[in-house]
Amino acid sequence: MYSDKYSLCFQPDATLIEQVKVMKLQLGEVIGWYNSKNSLAHLTIAEFQASEKDIERMHQQIQRCCSGFIPVETHLSSFGTYPNGTFFLEVDSIAKSQLKAYAQKLFQTLQLKNAYKCTDPHLSIGRKLDETKMQQAYALFEQPNLSFCCDLIVLRRLNMERRQFDIISHYPFLSQPIEEETQLRLF
């Protein structure tokens, strides 16, 4: 069965997307091309392979989860790195714990097999940077003071021609109470 690569992400607002785009362009002027330079700002929840049939099933599940999610005021006030060369904007601890809970709910609901699951919400500026480029990134930027209201998850499909993900669905947080499915029994 044919499958595509998909990415489920928390999507910042247009203002933050533009601010991060400017940061990525500034970094590119200093270090040249790098992984994630052209990607739209996002916080990855999971990446996975799926068929169109799988996506149709997941669409309703994601929608149902997001209808119960409450928007989260998210602050990005420091940079961080991972050993794999990722340079990122760190999510504040209060928002991070809420976004982790939302991601866990999605993992439990979707039951994604063989998926990359992000367990530490962050907003990547660059990936696969060597130590020198990492130091240049730290030197370039002052301490960030960015924020956005996280109120949307997007589903993205990898566009093989552009080698970038394209957004194919939006799932707004609706702050509605969720009725858990209950099983009725006859005695």
Residue spans for each PLM region:
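Basic, often amphipathic N-terminal segments
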Residues: 1-71, 93-149, 165-187
